[in-house]
Amino acid sequence: MQAEQTRCAAARGSAEMESLWHAAPGDEEIPLHPPPTPGAMSLESDSSLDTLAEKIECDLMDLLGDMGPPCDIDEEEDQLFAEALPPLYSQPTENPPPPNAANSIPEQAGKQPAEGKTNTERNERPMRRKRREDGDVGQPNPRRRTHARSRSPRAGSTSSQQPPSSSGGARKPCVRREAGDRETSEKPARGKYCAPFPRQAPHQCQSPPAQTASQKPPPRPQRPPSTTAYSPDRTPHDHQERRHEGAGKMIRSVVTKQDARKPPRRVPHRGCGTGRHGRRTPEKWGAPPSMVVPLKFTREYWEKHRNELKKPVWRDYSRSACTARDPARAHDSGAECPPTEKRDERRTCAPSQPRWLREDRNAARFFDKAKDAFGGLALPTDDMCTRNRDLLRAMADEVVDDDDCEDLDLTRQMCFPTMIGPQSRAAGPVGARMDSWSELCRRAAFLKARWSSQPSVTRVARAVRSLYLTNCSFDELLEACDETLTWMLWHQFEDERLCPHDPIFSNIYALVQGLVTRLGAVLHCHLAASKSPLADPTRTSELPLQSATCPLTLFLTFADRFARVMHGHPHVTLVGHKIVDHEGVLRTLYLPGMCARKIPVVLDQHANVCRKEECRLLCAQLLGKQYTVGKFLCCDLYA
């Protein structure tokens, strides 16, 4: 009976509160309690009034907004309210049991709603809130913040006494939380579940602006794909997508922020990509070609001017009258300039097939591809040796010619005696070989003056002498040894200072290396047999020229002394001749031409006394001048 009266009172109180809410204007104060009636006073008791006050207070707090969680709500009511909330707002314990049918359904069935609180009444508040947001009910003023929650005696209440709370203590005033504040650890613990405030679903608790901000923006309308492969209103990335679609797989291009800011560029249609660079492929429409190949390097130009393009660019050729490009020059010289085809046939002849190619089928099948490699069987008919000899003579003329040169041919023949051309206008034959000491002194003085005053002549002479010593024969190598000792002897005779960087002294090392290479094991065996100090590899002191036992050891001792003196002074340009030969022993032991005449005799004597087959064989090969003994195969199929 008591429960029935409580429910009836709660229903009447809720109806009266709703009527008062509809009747109250938006900016006026809302009365906390309706005026008491005599019928209601007779039926209400202390417990029913307490329940009604709690109901009205919750309704007011729902209308006023988020004022903070209540501090003394019953634990049973919290558990029931947590059931009504979605799973997102129910905070379980640290290790909740896994949800399954075995442990969740019996627990829900065993729970009973609390007395005076039904699920229908709890669900009415969200529905009324929803109707107010839709516009059915007048919206309250959000700026009104009145009536802090407290349990002090209310004005107009029929009961002046306050019933004790479930916790046994007095109510504490709730403090309103501002938007954006975080919950601190000072919030009191409230049982197994802690339900947030206000007690509505998350989509109902938010204000209309917050709901609008949380919603996802509608998807942007996509442009339908174009049916044509290339259109002027599409970007280069769209064209790339269309090209990938044809392969059966859509590959979208990665568009960066910088590309997104660029305005769309109009792309020409297929076949319209022409301009000053010529026709281009669709892939290169966006940028000019990286390199424009000139007409000079086309295949047709190369086939037509093959011989001209194959010439080294550093060679300054003097064209003959028949090959001159200027017809006037050809006419003045009395020769007729032949056409290009005849000139090509004269320069490069294509002979008929060799006899082995016509008769030997096995060889023709075996060399089917090799006969066409690197230009095939066509060979140049020009005399390569004559052409390069003329080129070397032209380079010598260039370095020799100066203001003091009266006769170019004579000056060239004096500086480079072996460079004697067929058009020489010299009075007499000029060569490197001389039979008198006075003639040698005149030639040596001329070379000394030229090498000291013209560095270009010195540079060219040094280079050609180094190549000569590397490729000369054994007899020429012995003559080079005589040339070095004679040059030293002339400096002693004229009391001239030595120049370590002249063409003769600067190539002493190359001369010694040539001797060691050609003599090989014979040199080591001869030095050991004659007990020469040169055979000691650990020697650190200089050897005197008096220690020489033969012309070969004399030259090697002189080269050793000269190298040791110049090793400590690499940048010295002039050195006294007494540093190398202080006592002048060389002029007492050496006569010009001794090396070329006496060293072969020394090798022959060593071959007679040595028992090693290697020494006898090597000496016989060098002295017998049978340089063709080492050739075993010589086949020339181009003939």
Curated annotation (Swiss-Prot):
GO terms for molecular function: RNA binding; zinc ion binding. InterPro entries: ICP27-like. Residues 203-215 have a biased composition (Polar residues). A zinc finger (CHC2-type) spans 525-615. Residues 175-189, 234-247, 326-348 have a biased composition (Basic and acidic residues). Residues 153-169 have a biased composition (Low complexity). Residues 1-45, 63-287, 322-355 are annotated as: Disordered. Residues 142-152 have a biased composition (Basic residues). Keywords: Early protein, Host cytoplasm, Host nucleus, Host-virus interaction, Metal-binding, RNA-binding, Zinc, Zinc-finger. Pfam families: Herpes_UL69. One of its GO terms (cellular component) is host cell cytoplasm. GO terms for biological process: regulation of DNA-templated transcription. It comes from the Viruses. The keyword Electron transport does not apply. The keyword Metal-binding applies. It is found in: Host cytoplasm; Host nucleus. Zn(2+) binds at C525, H606, C610, C615. Belongs to the HHV-1 ICP27 protein family. Multifunctional regulator of the expression of viral genes that mediates nuclear export of viral intronless mRNAs. This immediate early (EI) protein promotes the nuclear export of viral intronless mRNAs. This is mRNA export factor. It comes from Psittacid herpesvirus 1 (isolate Amazon parrot/-/97-0001/1997) (PsHV-1).
